[in-house]
Amino acid sequence: MAVPFVEDWDLVQTLGEGAYGEVQLAVNRITEEAVAVKIVDMKRAIDCPENIKKEICINKMLNHENVVKFYGHRREGNIQYLFLEYCSGGELFDRIEPDIGMPEQDAQRFFHQLMAGVVYLHGIGITHRDIKPENLLLDERDNLKISDFGLATVFRHNNRERLLNKMCGTLPYVAPELLKRKEFHAEPVDVWSCGIVLTAMLAGELPWDQPSDSCQEYSDWKEKKTYLNPWKKIDSAPLALLHKILVENPSARITIPDIKKDRWYNKPLNRGAKRPRATSGGMSESSSGFSKHIHSNLDFSPINSGSSEENVKFSSSQPEPRTGLSLWDTGPSNVDKLVQGISFSQPTCPDHMLVNSQLLGTPGSSQNPWQRLVKRMTRFFTKLDADKSYQCLKETFEKLGYQWKKSCMNQVTVSTMDRRNNKLIFKINLVEMDEKILVDFRLSKGDGLEFKRHFLKIKGKLSDIVSSQKVWFPVT
């Protein structure tokens, strides 16, 4: 069951955890509107109140179609609530196939929208500082929106620009000048991160662990060894643009106005007929069978204590995506009630609550939004019942050396290290659906592409029990 929050609104699921608190999903039980609620415990760290105040101030400045909306905030004692748009198309990383990428025309379209969002941010003096696919969300029309401004800062005010000196972001996406511990301009740093995102979209992999001379892949790039991966998978026109973006000297790096003049950026790409997308989870979608799904618009980046610009802040996590609700344009009057309300209580096991449609189905409603499954590429049906499927999963985890625990009814939390020796955590739910068992994988912390690689490895180990049954998502 959902937990009442304020009048007509329920808290129905935890979306992510971070250094200072968590993100919950709030749903209006009458209109089915959905809003992400960032719940912050201000006592978690000395610098928490100042950081949250800064995040709220920045969010209040934002209003653009390619940036997530900020609805408002309120505080109760030591708890601060931030209310934000809840996007319905998922995270960008879910559209990137590991080691393959995505169709070039899709990458170009997303890159256009990313540029539009970044141009807007820079135009009002804001730098994001943690641009990556986990922080780029899609709405129900596949329009890209930039999310999570926990590391963002103002670099220009009243036409006066200040240099930055803080190391923050996610290592594979940061610009090389950040690692030199010197002052640097803000805008070229975001441009560099956008270039890494474009590389990931076109090649399905990140080019290096970090842009330093100690990294062989980065040295190879500087020596123009484009016959190596990932560059050899990228066509010459977009590769030429990447050669202008991923330039070590920030003063020589291409600017966004010049990116917009680039040949590939302006090249009309033939989209052709829209084909059903075969997914790595044995699912498919078609233009006649599409279900909206909801994902969080927050990434809780870990923040170290201390507020000076010299602090190192690297992000390595993102929220867990997680329920299949219809999302309509959120009405201001309803959100006002949510922002101003005062009642709050905590769900005991929200992940299981929402994944198991039997728990939240409303009697008499054969197609109510609670029963719609999240559309995601990382899932499959098994040929076994729940208990036997669970046993096979446990055996596979042990063979692969994963740490795991049963964290909730029909849910397993798995921890491991990725190829960069960073923590990777994902959750697996076993869901009974049409008398079949669906094994649903969701990223909790870590790199999205690494998560998908581990999913494919696990699925391969379980090939004997994986069903070929596909799910066709209904029109909503």
UniProtKB/Swiss-Prot annotation:
Keyword Transit peptide recorded: no
Pfam families: Pkinase
Catalytic residues as annotated in Swiss-Prot or TrEMBL: 130
Similarity field: Belongs to the protein kinase superfamily. CAMK Ser/Thr protein kinase family. NIM1 subfamily.
Residues modified to Phosphoserine: 280, 286, 296, 301, 317, 345, 463, 467-468
Subunit structure: Interacts (phosphorylated by ATR) with RAD51. Interacts with and phosphorylates CLSPN, an adapter protein that regulates the ATR-dependent phosphorylation of CHEK1. Interacts with BRCA1. Interacts with and phosphorylates CDC25A, CDC25B and CDC25C. Interacts with FBXO6, which regulates CHEK1. Interacts with PPM1D, which regulates CHEK1 through dephosphorylation. Interacts with TIMELESS; DNA damage-dependent. Interacts with FEM1B; activates CHEK1 in response to stress. Interacts with TLK1. Interacts with XPO1 and YWHAZ. Interacts with CDK5RAP3; antagonizes CHEK1.
Entries under SUPFAM superfamilies matching the protein: Protein kinase-like (PK-like)
Alphabetized CDD domains for the sequence: STKc_Chk1 (cd14069)
Underlying gene: Chek1
Domain Protein kinase: 9-265
Autoinhibitory region: region residues: 391-476
Record comment regarding domains: The autoinhibitory region (AIR) inhibits the activity of the kinase domain.
Keyword NAD: no
Activity regulation text: Activated through phosphorylation predominantly by ATR but also by ATM in response to DNA damage or inhibition of DNA replication. Activation is modulated by several mediators including CLSPN, BRCA1 and FEM1B. Proteolytic cleavage at the C-terminus by SPRTN during normal DNA replication activates the protein kinase activity.
GO cellular component labels: centrosome; chromatin; chromosome, telomeric region; condensed nuclear chromosome; cytoplasm; nucleus; protein-containing complex; replication fork
Annotated spans, Interaction with CLSPN: 1-265
GO biological process: apoptotic process; apoptotic process involved in development; cellular response to caffeine; cellular response to mechanical stimulus; chromatin remodeling; DNA damage checkpoint signaling; DNA damage response; DNA repair
EC number: 2.7.11.1
Principal location: nucleus
Binding residue positions for ATP: 15-23, 38
UniProt PTM comment: Phosphorylated by ATR in a RAD17-dependent manner in response to ultraviolet irradiation and inhibition of DNA replication. Phosphorylated by ATM in response to ionizing irradiation. ATM and ATR can both phosphorylate Ser-317 and Ser-345 and this results in enhanced kinase activity. Phosphorylation at Ser-345 induces a change in the conformation of the protein, activates the kinase activity and is a prerequisite for interaction with FBXO6 and subsequent ubiquitination at Lys-436. Phosphorylation at Ser-345 also increases binding to 14-3-3 proteins and promotes nuclear retention. Ubiquitinated. Mono or diubiquitination promotes nuclear exclusion. The activated form (phosphorylated on Ser-345) is polyubiquitinated at Lys-436 by some SCF-type E3 ubiquitin ligase complex containing FBXO6 promoting its degradation. Ubiquitination and degradation are required to terminate the checkpoint and ensure that activated CHEK1 does not accumulate as cells progress through S phase, when replication forks encounter transient impediments during normal DNA replication. 'Lys-63'-mediated ubiquitination by TRAF4 at Lys-132 activates cell cycle arrest and activation of DNA repair.
Name used for this protein in its record: Serine/threonine-protein kinase Chk1
Subcellular location per the Swiss-Prot or TrEMBL entry: Nucleus; Chromosome; Cytoplasm; Cytoplasm, Cytoskeleton, Microtubule organizing center, Centrosome
